[in-house]
């Protein structure tokens, strides 16, 4: 396509114009991704399999003018896909065949119906949303229910994976109403200028339509524009400019009244800029209407997230009903749409049935008892930790919001917690805590990274002088900015482990809540909460295996350009698999593979050696955060780094047996029990359910394991995919080992959804995000007219490196500070 188009919306429009012109007579027998690929059931009758077409671009609802831009589109044959070869692949007769193109083609064909249905909103290549039942999320957003669809090859059959999904969209209304909803201001109120930055970020790239300008025929001319920011940081009534047409300086309201006979109802609102950096165009928001079907790409606020979870939470029966009912209809699969016929595609409208097994839960051991597991959980009543940690004293910091509630007896609360620790088998000094500090933190609208550090840091400095092993911090709010500052100060700046508790909860002195906080206390002081008997550890009981968890977390929407990704590696060190110290690094933004893996593995191997007096004979790696398309990259890039770390640590003959298992948790496979006796109270599969046939890979070893019991809604199993295995695991052996590990998550009294090494790796990466919180959550003044320059990205990366320093303090490197 020449000239090149980078904007997806425009590229899609070019393909739409092609469908209506060059391919008008063939619309029913072609499918496209509206980006660069066209799929046809047979070869097009064009000379030399190549065709060049000039098209004139115009937006939907507009007409071609003399200024309309022209594009040269080249269509050429790039590949012939043989369905027979794909069938041989799924039948197990052609392992060397690459199914990628066939899968892509089938996905494009299946997406044609929902993509072209005016009642459906496509979002990405595989999600399609129904625009008939919007649920309010607040702050100008709504949640829409949609359906995910993707082709999955399995043994002897090709499957279509369908699942329900929900996403936030901008509410379809005028932009003035949207502004009032987002800011929480009453209609007619003035918006404080200090909110303009955040408002601009919310509106940036939002597409709107206007109709205040009349065309040659005298009728309103509908124009589509994109908002690039907030205009001039002032209300419309306060903006004046020299108008050549009226030969005088006029305000925005005066101009629209004289030019278009429009009296602005909200002159106190800021204008939206729909121009460019060099040539801004200001529009009063009340004359702009949000175009439908625009997904919100930034991070939701806590309250919005809570609403989203409520809407998305459906029991298994209801979830399955949506899929086979509204889902298949929305996707054009039931009844099947005509476009499937030319491709000779038929999709069954019934869910497939697959075999499953339920693994037996392990025995949970404490110092004084074994616990019965019921529904994948147990309680802490009258038990002592398997190995209680000791400390003569601990510090307490009480954070209070300025003007907050009256002072409670925090010394009494802390003493109650001390007693709970001792009751649970820890040894905490009878006079603890001797160190207590109360700290007032700024009001929410006055909080910044700098103001929070200024308020809280002196308390840590005071504590550091007294050298407590650990500090208990009472938080007055769930504000992540406050939590992140506490963790930054404790982990990075002062090197003191911290445990946070919500003031509103711990002040009630509930034994259950106190006991749960004590779980973290004991682990961070290098104790052991519970364990499994040797029989349930299997080969792990030999004491020669190090289990590793790896993950990478990337900047979230709203982060400043160039903000680094964070890589984390955790590894077991003891025979009970209770302690998992970690290595943590910044790396290039959005890089999937772990750059510093060799050095991080060396740190983990050296720590294992210092505890055990030898290096492990086996290494089992659970790698989180990797998509299917990157499995081979892990083998090619990360496996050699692990081997190199081993060679550097041991002698020349040191060659531990390495296995790498990818942990998938963001997939769309769900299971619905056919037998009520094999279901839990919600109708989900019983904890311990494992599926390794029917929906798994054709040639490789993978399985789905639901080790946990869901609290609500439809549970999602973890997907484990073995990409390298020199330990020669039998399928049941690895499944049982992974399942039993899920009962060893130290800070819970239940089995967890993914095995602890992957879970801990995720947690340590999340902890790293606290250290660069300000970059990951850009302030209101973040550039709205960003140049997206490499210089800007480099500056932000450098700032992150400065905040990060050397990362977690040396005092904490051998502890589970990240819990």
Roles of regions detected by a PLM:
Residues 1-819:
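Long, low-complexity, intrinsically disordered terminal regions
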């Amino acid at each position: 396509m020449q000239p090149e188009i980078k904007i997806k919306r425009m590229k899609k429009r070019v393909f739409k114009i092609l469908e209506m012109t060059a391919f008008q007579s063939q619309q029913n027998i072609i499918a496209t991704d509206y980006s660069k690929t066209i799929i046809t059931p047979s070869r097009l009758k064009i000379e030399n399999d190549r065709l060049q077409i000039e098209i004139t671009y115009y937006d939907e609802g507009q007409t071609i003018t003399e200024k309309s831009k022209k594009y040269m589109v080249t269509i050429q044959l790039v590949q012939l896909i043989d369905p027979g070869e794909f069938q041989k692949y799924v039948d197990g007769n052609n392992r060397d065949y690459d199914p990628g193109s066939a899968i892509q083609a089938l996905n494009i064909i299946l997406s044609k119906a929902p993509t072209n249905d005016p009642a459906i909103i496509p979002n990405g290549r595989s999600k399609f949303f129904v625009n008939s039942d919007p649920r309010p999320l607040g702050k100008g957003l709504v949640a829409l229910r949609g359906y995910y669809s993707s082709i999955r090859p399995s043994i002897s059959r090709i499957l279509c994976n369908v699942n329900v999904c929900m996403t936030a969209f901008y509410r379809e209304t005028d932009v003035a109403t949207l502004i009032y909803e987002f800011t929480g201001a009453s209609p007619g109120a003035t918006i404080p200028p200090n909110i303009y930055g955040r408002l601009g970020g919310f509106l940036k790239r939002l597409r709107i339509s206007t109709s205040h300008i009349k065309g040659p025929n005298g009728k309103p001319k509908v124009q589509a524009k994109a908002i690039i920011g907030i205009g001039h940081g002032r209300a419309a009534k306060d903006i004046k400019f020299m108008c050549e047409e009226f030969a005088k300086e006029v305000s925005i309201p005066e101009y629209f009244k004289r030019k278009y006979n429009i009296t602005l109802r909200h002159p106190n609102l800021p204008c939206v800029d729909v121009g460019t950096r060099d040539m801004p165009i200001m529009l009063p928001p009340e004359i702009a209407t949000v175009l439908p079907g625009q997904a919100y790409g930034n991070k939701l606020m806590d309250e919005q997230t809570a609403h989203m979870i409520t809407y998305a939470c459906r029991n298994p029966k209801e979830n399955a009903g949506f899929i086979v009912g509204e889902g298949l209809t929305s996707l054009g699969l039931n009844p099947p749409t005509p476009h499937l016929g030319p491709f000779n595609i038929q999709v069954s409208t019934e869910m497939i049935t697959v075999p499953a097994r339920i693994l037996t839960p392990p025995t949970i051991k404490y110092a004084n008892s074994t616990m019965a597991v019921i529904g994948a959980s147990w309680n802490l009543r009258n038990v002592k930790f398997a190995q209680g940690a000791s400390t003569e004293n601990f510090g307490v910091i009480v954070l209070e919001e300025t003007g907050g509630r009256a002072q409670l007896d925090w010394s009494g609360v802390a003493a109650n917690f001390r007693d709970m620790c001792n009751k649970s088998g820890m040894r905490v000094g009878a006079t603890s805590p001797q160190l207590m500090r109360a700290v007032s933190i700024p009001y929410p609208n006055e909080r910044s990274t700098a103001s929070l550090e200024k308020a809280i840091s002196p308390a840590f400095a005071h504590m550091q002088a007294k050298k407590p092993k650990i500090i208990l911090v009472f938080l007055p709010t769930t504000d992540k900015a406050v939590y992140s500052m506490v963790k930054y100060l404790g982990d990075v700046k002062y090197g003191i482990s911290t445990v946070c508790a919500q003031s509103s909860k711990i002040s009630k002195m509930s034994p259950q809540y106190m006991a749960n906080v004590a779980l973290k206390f004991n682990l961070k002081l290098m104790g052991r909460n519970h364990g499994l008997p040797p029989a349930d550890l299997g080969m792990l009981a030999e004491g020669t295996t190090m289990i590793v968890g790896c993950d990478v977390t990337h900047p979230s929407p709203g982060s400043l350009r160039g903000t680094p990704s964070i890589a984390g590696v955790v590894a077991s060190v003891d025979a009970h698999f209770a302690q998992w110290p970690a290595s943590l690094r910044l790396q290039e933004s959005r890089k999937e593979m772990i750059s510093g893996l060799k050095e991080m593995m060396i740190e983990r191997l050296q720590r294992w050696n210092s505890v055990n007096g030898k290096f492990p004979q086996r290494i089992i790696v659970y790698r989180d955060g990797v998509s299917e398309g990157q499995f081979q990259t892990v083998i090619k890039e990360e496996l050699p780094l692990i081997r190199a770390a081993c060679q550097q640590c041991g002698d020349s003959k040191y060659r531990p047996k390495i296995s790498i298992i990818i942990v998938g948790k963001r997939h769309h496979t769900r299971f619905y029990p056919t037998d009520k006796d094999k279901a839990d109270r919600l109708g989900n599969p019983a904890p311990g359910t494992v599926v390794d046939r029917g929906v798994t890979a054709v040639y490789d070893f993978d399985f789905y394991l639901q080790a946990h019991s869901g609290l609500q809604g439809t549970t999602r199993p973890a997907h484990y995919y073995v990409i390298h295995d020199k330990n020669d695991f039998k399928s049941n052996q690895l499944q049982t080992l992974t399942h039993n590990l899920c009962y060893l998550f130290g800070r819970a009294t239940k089995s967890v959804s993914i095995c602890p090494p992957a879970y801990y790796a995720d947690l340590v990466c999340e902890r790293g995000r606290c250290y660069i919180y300000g970059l990951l959550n850009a302030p209101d003044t973040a550039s709205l007219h960003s140049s997206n320059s490499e210089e800007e990205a480099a500056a932000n990366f450098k700032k992150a490196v400065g905040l990060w320093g050397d990362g977690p303090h040396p005092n904490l490197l051998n502890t589970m500070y990240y819990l």
